[in-house]
Amino acid sequence: AASLAQVHKAKLKGASENVVIKVLRPNIHKQVHRNIRVMKAGGFLVNLFYKESGRLKLKEVIHDYEKTIFKELDLKIEAANTTVTKKNFSDSDLLFIPKVFWDHTTVNVLTLEEIDGLACTDIQAMDELGIDRKILAENGVKIFLDQVFRDNFFHADMHPGNIFVS
């Protein structure tokens, strides 16, 4: 998301809760449209000059990517996905999903409860605290499998900026 949005910490006016605010970058829609046009032109040229390229189905791949990237540019969709995942794991001790502040969320701005914890990349701190990384990995796999097979709903924004250990 770093290429699409910026993330800032804040405090809501008149509230005591700390939040994280994700804001789409200025002109990001224009940039994405331009990039898609370049991809389509590149795909056309590859198909034009390489007979074997037909099996790659570049037109379809680019079309699917276009649909996916424009969904990522609607932060209300991300907020809804976060809410569904929070509900799906409401009884779990393995995963904490932040609350969405819907009154402060739009297509271009997502406001979430701030989460405390160690960055999942801070191996040294986890080792110093005696966190068993094998159990952590097993729990991660269980969470993934629950999303796929139990919930049939996979919120796939798993990157180090979104995963904290506590």
Show where each model-derived region lies.
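Conserved catalytic cores of large enzyme domains
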Residues: 1-166
